Regions:
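Short beta-strand and beta-hairpin "edge-sheet" elements
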Residues: 24, 66-96, 195, 329-361
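Oligomerization/assembly interface segments of phage tail-like spikes and tubes
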Residues: 32-51, 89-100, 186, 250, ...
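Acidic, small/polar-enriched beta strand-loop surface segments
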Residues: 2-7, 211-351, 368
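Short intrinsically disordered coil segments
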Residues: 57-62, 109-114, 225-231, 265-267, ...
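A mature extracytoplasmic/lumenal domain signature
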Residues: 47, 97-99, 198, 254, ...
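Beta-strand-rich assembly/attachment modules of structural machines
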Residues: 1-123, 127
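Charged- and aromatic-enriched interaction segments used to assemble
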Residues: 90, 96-239
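Solvent-exposed, acidic/flexible segments
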Residues: 74, 114-119, 172-180, 240-243, ...
Length: 368
């Protein structure tokens, strides 16, 4: 059985942290690793330990305490404590992964970008944030360092064009108040993928935001998921007709003919089916186009699987795969007669103290 421990530190806002407890007595811990999302950690602690103090100060302080889950010396995940809640005899702890720190964080300057690289601009959001006093988490960047040059505010303009006028991408203190939203918008535009990684480096933990362009992870021919070997139950393979569409229209901000919009379609060999996506947060043609393309790809109508429960097994030991990886799944054929398909790991939910890990997956060709 893997040996787990839970470590608490105090983030100092200058890129460092002070460790305050190396063996928190947590109950019901769950570690969440996510592709293109914050991830994090949830747990509870018995009431008799909920008021732990170090040097007279409480251990559990929102937006100050970080908690990490370590398995046999390897950090499997962690996050920043945001919302401790007393629930009867226990204190519930909710820790958001480091990418979630940008949520609700504002841009304090003024910047207008006509042509640029979305990945580089996303890094600028972190650099801008961490340059502020008390906002530095010590996040570093690894992996891809660039994506593609484009007119970020108007992706309908070809990158090779020299337009007379183009709508710029704006960052400013009066309207840019959620940098996590901006970061994810840039990830969708490029597109790029990312995940957060924590690892020991001597006596400190380094925090690395890993980028992949256009994707992160690899097709792992050395690993496999097989029902009856390391997959506990036959996964539910669905072919939902209500999600199928051959024509997608996205309607964003505005009214009537002035609405931001984009249409995408594909010939499928089946009857044509429409889907209308309304989202008033979409304000540019580039956003509408990216959303329509993503919706169309996800609505091909081919059989899909979304969840797997896997156990520790030589075929795929915990830690041998990461979010973003693609792994072959072999299952028993159901009414769809799907037995072998490649799935991409979008999320890993680890329950320390058990040998069972829950994976959020999608059919690889639907998300790449």
């Amino acid at each position: 059985m893997t040996e787990w421990r839970f470590i608490a530190s105090r983030l100092d806002g200058t890129g460092g942290e002070d460790f305050i407890d190396f063996d928190l007595p947590l109950d019901e811990p769950e570690v969440h690793q996510v592709l293109n999302g914050p991830g994090g950690l949830t747990a509870s602690i018995p009431h008799e330990h909920a008021h732990l103090r170090v040097d007279g100060a409480p251990v559990f302080v929102p937006w100050s305490t970080a908690i990490y889950a370590e398995a046999s010396g390897v950090i499997r995940g962690g996050g920043i404590l945001t919302d401790p809640v007393e629930e009867g005899p226990k204190l519930s702890l909710d820790c958001v992964g480091f990418p979630g720190y940008l949520g609700g964080t504002r841009y304090t300057g003024i910047r207008s970008i006509e042509r640029g690289d979305p990945l580089k601009v996303s890094r600028h959001l972190w650099e801008h944030t961490q340059a502020r006093k008390s906002f530095d988490l010590g996040v570093e960047f690894v992996g891809a360092s660039s994506s593609r040059e484009m007119f970020i505010g108007d992706d309908d303009v070809p990158p090779s064009a020299t337009p007379q006028k183009v709508d710029p991408y704006e960052l400013n203190y009066w309207s840019t108040h959620d940098l996590a939203k901006e970061f994810d918008h840039l990830a969708e535009l490029a597109p790029f993928e990312y995940r957060m990684e924590h690892a020991w480096d001597g006596d400190r933990i380094r925090h690395r935001l890993r980028y992949g362009y256009p994707t992160l992870g690899a097709r792992r021919t050395d690993l496999r998921f097989v029902v009856g070997e390391n997959v506990l139950e036959i996964p539910k393979i669905e072919m939902p007709g209500e999600e199928y569409a051959s024509h997608v229209i996205v309607l964003g901000a505005g009214e009537g003919r002035s609405m931001t919009r984009d249409e995408q379609s594909v010939t499928t060999g089946r009857l044509g089916r429409d889907v209308v996506v309304s989202d008033k947060t979409i304000t540019t043609p580039a956003q509408a186009k990216a959303r329509a393309q993503a919706e169309l790809k996800a609505r091909t109508g081919t059989p899909d699987v979304t969840d797997l429960q896997v156990i520790q097994h030589p075929n795929a030991v915990l830690g041998s795969y990461q979010v973003g990886d693609e792994i072959a799944l072999t299952t028993a054929g159901g009414w769809t007669d799907e037995r072998d398909l490649w799935v991409k790991i979008l999320g890993i939910q680890i329950t320390p103290g058990t040998d069972v890990t829950t994976l959020q997956v999608r059919r690889a060709e639907k998300v790449n």
